[in-house]
Amino acid sequence: EMIDYIKKSLPDCKTVNNVAVVGKKIPDGWLDLRAGIAASSDELERIPNKSTDEMLIYFSSGTTGMPKMILRDYSYPLGHIITAKYWQRVRENGLHLTMSDSGWAKFAWGKIYGQWICGATIVAYDNEKFNAHNTLSLLQEIKLTSFCAPPTIFRFLIKEDIAKYDLSSIEHCSIAGEPLNPEVFYKFREL
């Protein structure tokens, strides 16, 4: 279904040169992404760039209509030093986890750029479906120092018998995406 939609859209997309697909049914003329990755070199040729060069494109959520492209340049990650250092309070040689799927902008600004620049080790923990027990067990096991998640995740975490987990290594927690109700804040702070 998605392939058919893309095929119908291609005539209107004059700048698209190639389409890469993951899967078994790859249309004629399209690229097999996995085969391309397997055939790629392990060496990356660094291409000179300036801070004003285009780096990535986000897409808005489309709350006022169709999603819009938001272009970011190479100076963009530097802005998130402030995010990591002063909001998330990551520290050099600390262990940081932001709960965010890679499809969200928060994945980049809340989990990679400023955090690495500030010297934190980043925890890559992606599961198919959120499970509060598994998450709390991980936080206890790895001795996390900073943690960022949407308030919904904090609400699920406090529904577990959270006192049985040793989360004493966590020095700072932060939220993003929605308001955090006081009950959840105070319960988590008690730990």
What are these regions (language model features)?
Residues 78-95, 99-145, 160:
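Conserved AMP-binding/adenylation subdomain of ANL enzymes
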Residues 1-9, 25, 125-127, 140, ...:
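Adenylate-forming
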Residues 21, 27, 37-59, 66, ...:
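Conserved pre-ATP/AMP-binding loop-to-beta segment of ANL
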Residues 54, 60-63, 96, 139, ...:
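Conserved S/T- and glycine-rich ATP-binding loop of Class I adenylate-forming
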